């Protein structure tokens, strides 16, 4: 009988409660509320390692992150502007698209690779893994003191931008901006539309 490998050492009770409280305070923070510095490459890597712990049926790892450094923002801004021009957007919108490449002190792209021909791992499970990886990354950044937000928009479906970040079997899922929060967290209050947690009650025959 094969021995069961030991699991990770549990956190002390007080530390565990502190971590749960900290995670419960996370919320999305847009670029105008972010200040420098953004995450270092080491911080991004630590967050990506946490993202890798997402539930991953089949061990496909259907996502990766691409960091856009400060030196690459100008090139990205030209791609954004060119895409807006090709969509026939007016000059003001073209300049706004160009400026979005400079959003946030830290910027990363989330690239997804979904394989439709894996019999035991349907597409929706792979997308769930991508989303879980994103959430793990955001949580890890939060624990390290960064605020962050995932952003989409027309740029993620722009063919030239996709080609710059993705292989032919990949798609650009979203952008992630990160930095230090400019102000204390004020999570948005959500009106419950359905119970968040409930107990299943089987229907009687």
Model-predicted regions and their roles:
Residues 186-205:
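Phosphate/diphosphate-binding glycine-rich loops and adjacent basic-rich segments that engage nucleotide
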Residues 51, 108, 114-163:
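Small-aliphatic-rich amphipathic alpha-helix that forms the alpha element of a beta-alpha
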Residues 22, 107-109, 175-177, 199:
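Conserved hydrophobic/aromatic beta-strand scaffold that supports enzyme active sites
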Residues 70, 159-161, 167-168:
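Short Asp/Glu-rich motifs
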Residues 67-69, 112, 180:
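A general secondary-structure junction signal
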Residues 60-63, 143, 173:
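Short secondary-structure junction motifs
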Residues 98-100, 164-190:
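A glycine-rich helix N-cap at a beta->alpha junction
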Residues 1-103, 202-205:
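N-terminal amphipathic, basic helical "cap/leader" segment at the start of enzyme domains
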